[in-house]
Amino acid sequence: MKEFKVKVLSPVGLHARPAAAFAAQAKSSGCTVKLSKIVDGTATSAVDGASVLRVMTLGVKCGDEIYVQVEGEGEEQTAAALQVIAESTED
């Protein structure tokens, strides 16, 4: 399992297009991806990173930190791709 924390840099956070891009990458990878928002140093309940609706329910805003768990074949590559999406400044 590959785990990492990353600060979301998109001006809209993980909403709409960034959430859709994150979920699409997670789904197409074939890996199990779990995503949590970090609040006061503690991760919230994890959601399915391959579900755009679940990702959006976290309410991740620009500057928030997220905790991501990726498990499965190709987890290193999937984790790297998800980190790029989270750190993108595009909305």
Region annotations inferred by a language model:
Residues F4, C31-V33, I66:
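Conserved beta-strand core positions
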Residues M1-S10:
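Short amphipathic
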Residues M56-D91:
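C-terminal structural segments of small proteins and small subunits
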Residues L9-L53, T57-V60:
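Compact, glycine-rich, soluble single-domain proteins
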Residues E3, A50-L53, G74:
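Compositionally biased, low-complexity segments enriched in small residues
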Residues K7, S36, Q69-E71:
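Solvent-exposed beta-strand sheet faces enriched in polar/charged residues
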